[in-house]
Amino acid sequence: MAVLTHGSPTPSGAYFDGKGINFTLFSAHAEQVTLCLFDEQGQERQIAMPARTGDIWHGYLPGGKPGQRYGYRVSGPFDPSRGHRFNPHKLLIDPRTRALEGKVGDDPRFTGGVSQPDVRDSAAALPKCLVIHEEYDWQGDKPPAIPWGNTVIYEAHVRGLTQLHPDIPPELRGTYAALAHPALIEHLKTLGITTLELLPVQFHIDEPRLQKMGLSNYWGYNVLAPFAVDPDYASGREGISPLRELRDAIKALHNAGIEVILDVVFNHSAELDVFGPTLCQRGIDNASYYWLTPDGEYDNITGCGNALRLSHPYVTQWVIDCLNYWRDSCHVDGFRFDLGTVLGRTPAFDQHAPLFAALAADERLSACKLIAEPWDIGLGGYQLGNFPTGFSEWNDQYRDAMRGFWLRGEVPRGTFAQHFAASSRLFEQRGRLPSASINQITAHDGFTLLDLLCFNQKHNQMNGEENRDGSDNNHSNNFGCEGLVADAAIWQRRKACQRALLTTLLLSQGTPMLLAGDEQGHSQQGNNNAYCQNNILTWLDWGSADRALMTFTADLIRLRQQIPALTQDQWWQSGDSNVQWLDSQGQALSDAAWEQGCQQQLQILLSQRWLVLINATDHECEMHLPEGEWEGIPPFGVSDHAERLTTWRGSAHTICVLIKRD
């Protein structure tokens, strides 16, 4: 019979010290915590945790070894009006587990009870936590440490990026191992990508609603165990764990000079609303982990049924420890925080919130690239530009302005210029650098770039919600024909705008983020909310990729890295050498000219050498170039023996870059 000694309240989680396992679990309101140990046949042994230090329950299992399966049962009041939902009939996952065995199905035994506790035992249905102790030889791995001014982010899904790549062995496609394959790394290097941002790779589950429809949470934002690598993206090769496979991939990417940023989800948990499954925090200490209303209901500021209370001291430390685990154990270079406003809620948003203070005080984490999605759906949830120094932010105002300028004719050039200059009004006056603006035309959430030019309406019927899900405010333009089938004239206009938007993104000041597949002409058939589509709709079709567009994109990124005004990460000032704003006659734009309605022609001179010519109108125009000798530069022309230009004739919806001869 296994016996627990008192052990220690630290380190947190389940820790193997070479002689046994120390177990800890936080619960401020529990009356008893029971450690449940499972053998290979699923037989359960229950042992009361023998000690409590403050709010940490702990015990030590002499002789315990890695591979031990475990979970917890936590007893206490079931009093929803006070926020307590303890139910010892429910086996619970350790919030700090670093591995899980099994899957979470749509099983009624997970129900914890709404007004009364549900007495059905859930142990047989719940995945078991695994104690792991994996040493790893990083072979001198060092972070690429790409300066923000040179950073080009590529947002991708592990499976979507690699599942159909013909040069990756079939058994590795869709896995972490595929990220390490030379064919994939060559693509990233050829493009000029410096930083790969991965959609969640933490252990996530599929919502019961999706399971009933035969769908899955493809994006992975329904995270159950944020310390654990999701085994769904592992190849399953013998002797290679999911954690090792992810480490191998990150090491290979680092060897190629590519950073890795993980998309992390700390705004809500997979337990959803009161009708959702009781799997972890709800049963451990509901009142500490979640934002609750005065009557004990979940404050659903995320739209996902619950919101994690990150201002609670222990929950703050849980997040910090999790981030440090990924940084230390997997050498990740940064994090993108989903619905990041929740990070700063106290409950109102506060730049000095406990989690922000803890991040700033942690030397290791504050040196990482930290990116926030600066909104949630709660009161005061939109916080673009308001995150503390050290964060960069997804800039949806940039996205909408550039779409509106090129596709709708709704945005004047003054607004275009302000966002082209890293949305300076949002960030400069608040002591932030241009790199704080994460510029994007598209992201995983919404239309792809090609679909933005082919669909005026979303087409999300496959999601099973009768096309109600997904945004209706897309600022798209199908140029007169809904869908991918259109005549040559329409496709000519679409392709011109496709290149114009890519050029704008990659030559704007700030940090560009390219959605994987946009450089290939990937379409999701008009689905702008493909979160549940784990199929060819979201997987990149490498066989039909637009090779010319890929070359165009790579040339743009190379061009970007040559222009000091874009790479030095300093604000442009009036009269300096970084930028001059010119009209179609090559003259400096006057204050009055900036205010002239929706004028959509201008020239932008960068670093006194590179001239960006913009015609966002629906007709051809002629521009007179500023003084000097100008010639084309790839991808807009060939510099060898090029014709020297004094004027530029631009077709509708076009952008061009010229270089000044020395």
UniProtKB/Swiss-Prot annotation:
SMART domains: Aamy (SM00642)
Single biological process term from Gene Ontology: glycogen catabolic process
Any Pfam family matching the protein: GlgX_C
Catalysed transformations (reactions): Hydrolysis of (1->6)-alpha-D-glucosidic linkages to branches with degrees of polymerization of three or four glucose residues in limit dextrin
EC number: 3.2.1.196
Pathway field: Glycan degradation; glycogen degradation
GO MF terms, alphabetically ordered: glycogen debranching enzyme activity; hydrolase activity, hydrolyzing O-glycosyl compounds
Chain positions of site Transition state stabilizer: 445
EC class (word): hydrolase
Entry annotation: catalytic residues: 338 (nucleophile), 373 (proton donor)
Alphabetical UniProt keywords: Carbohydrate metabolism, Glycogen metabolism, Glycosidase, Hydrolase
Family as reported in the entry's similarity comment: Belongs to the glycosyl hydrolase 13 family.
Known role: Removes maltotriose and maltotetraose chains that are attached by 1,6-alpha-linkage to the limit dextrin main chain, generating a debranched limit dextrin.
Name of this chain's protein: Glycogen debranching enzyme
Organism listed in the record: Yersinia pseudotuberculosis serotype O:1b (strain IP 31758)
